[in-house]
C-alpha cells in the first residue's frame, strides 16, 4: 500500500507485508533465521511497493482521462449494450472481452460505476495505439519516478510499443502488458485532484511544504474534473463497485480493480490481484489522504472487495484521529 497527500505530494506511508524486523540485521542473524526468511513462500524480503503490478480496473479512470484529453472519448456517447462478451470482429478469432454487468445507457460515467471492461476496450481502440503510447509516456511510463527510493518503472508494453489490436483493447481495462508501480499510480491519480497536474512525491516531512508538480497538464482540467466526479460515483452510487467504502461524513472517490494473472484467457489456475484506489476530495480538510492498495492472491477472498474492506478500516482510523 501507498498513502500520500494528493495535494502536496507528501508520502504518508509505504507499506509492504509480510515483512521482517530490520533490527535482526543490526544485531546479527543466525543462518537458520536467514534461511527461514529467504525460503519463506510469502517472501517477506520482497518489497512490494517498489515493484510494478498489473493494475486491472484501477487503470480505467486513467484511460478515461486520456480519452477525454485527446478527444477520442465523448462521455455522452452510448456504446450500446453488447451483452457480457464482445469482440471487434472475426479477426480476433476466439478472443472476446468479457464484463460482469449489463446496464444502460453505456456512457462513460456508468462504465466507471459498473467497471465495464467492454466499454474501456472500445475506448482504447478509439484512442489508438500511437496516442495511447504517447499519452502514457507523457504520464511517466518507462521513466524513473522522481523519488528518494528507487522504484520499478511502469510500462505499457513488454516492448517499446503496443503491437496488436487485442493488446490495445486489453490495455483499456488495465490488462494486456500494462504494469504500474503503486506510487506512480498515486501520482497519476493526484492529477484528478489538481486540475490535471501530477504531483511530485516527497518522503521527508516538510513544514508548510509547497507542492511541486512533476508533470504539468498530464490531463486537461476538464478531463480531470470529469473523472473526479465520475470516480466519486464509483464510491457513492449504490451500484458502484466501491460502494462498500461510502461514508456519510465526507465524500470519497476511487476505483476498484481485480487483475487476472494467468497464462491465457482459458487458464483457470492463475491468481488475482485485488486493488483499491481511494481518496478524499475536499482540498480544505485538515489531513487529506489518497490510498493505493494492492493485495496479492485475492482469488476466492472477494477480489477487490477484500481490499475495499481493508482500506475502509485504514480510512476510519485516519479520519477518526483527525
Predicted regions, residues:
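Beta-lactam-recognizing serine transpeptidase/beta-lactamase-like catalytic domain environment
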Residues: 2-58, 62-295, 303
Amino acid at each position: 500500500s501507498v498513502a500520500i497527500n494528493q495535494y502536496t505530494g507528501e508520502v504518508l506511508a509505504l507499506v509492504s507485508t509480510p515483512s521482517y524486523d530490520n533490527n535482526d540485521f543490526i544485531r546479527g542473524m543466525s543462518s537458520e533465521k536467514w534461511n527461514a526468511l529467504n525460503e519463506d513462500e510469502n517472501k517477506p524480503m520482497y518489497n512490494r511497493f517498489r515493484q510494478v503490478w498489473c493494475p486491472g480496473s484501477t487503470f480505467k479512470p486513467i484511460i478515461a482521462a486520456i480519452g477525454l484529453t485527446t478527444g477520442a472519448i465523448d462521455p455522452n456517447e452510448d456504446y450500446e449494450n453488447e451483452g457480457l462478451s464482445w469482440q471487434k470482429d472475426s479477426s480476433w478469432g476466439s478472443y472476446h472481452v468479457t464484463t460482469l454487468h449489463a446496464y444502460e445507457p453505456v456512457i462513460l460515467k456508468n462504465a466507471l460505476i459498473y467497471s465495464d471492461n467492454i466499454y474501456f476496450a472500445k475506448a482504447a481502440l478509439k484512442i489508438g495505439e500511437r496516442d495511447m503510447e504517447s499519452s502514457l509516456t507523457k504520464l511517466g511510463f518507462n521513466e524513473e519516478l522522481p523519488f528518494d527510493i528507487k522504484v520499478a518503472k511502469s510500462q505499457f508494453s513488454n516492448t517499446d510499443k503496443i503491437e496488436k489490436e487485442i493488446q490495445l483493447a486489453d490495455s483499456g481495462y488495465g490488462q494486456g502488458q500494462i504494469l504500474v508501480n503503486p506510487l506512480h499510480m498515486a501520482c497519476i491519480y493526484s492529477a484528478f485532484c489538481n486540475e490535471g497536474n501530477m504531483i511530485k512525491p516527497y518522503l521527508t516531512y516538510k513544514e508548510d511544504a509547497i507542492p511541486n508538480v512533476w508533470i504539468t497538464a498530464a490531463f486537461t482540467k476538464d478531463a480531470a474534473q470529469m473523472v473526479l466526479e465520475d470516480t466519486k460515483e464509483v464510491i457513492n452510487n449504490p451500484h458502484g463497485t466501491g460502494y462498500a467504502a461510502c461514508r456519510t461524513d465526507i465524500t470519497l472517490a476511487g476505483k476498484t480493480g481485480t487483475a487476472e494473472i494467468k497464462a491465457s484467457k482459458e487458464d483457470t489456475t492463475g491468481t488475482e490481484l485485488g486493488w483499491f484506489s481511494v481518496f478524499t476530495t475536499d482540498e480544505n480538510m485538515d489531513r487529506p489522504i489518497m490510498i493505493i492498495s494492492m493485495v496479492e492472491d485475492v482469488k476466492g477472498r472477494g477480489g477487490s472487495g477484500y481490499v475495499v474492506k481493508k482500506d475502509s478500516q485504514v480510512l476510519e482510523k485516519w479520519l477518526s484521529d483527525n
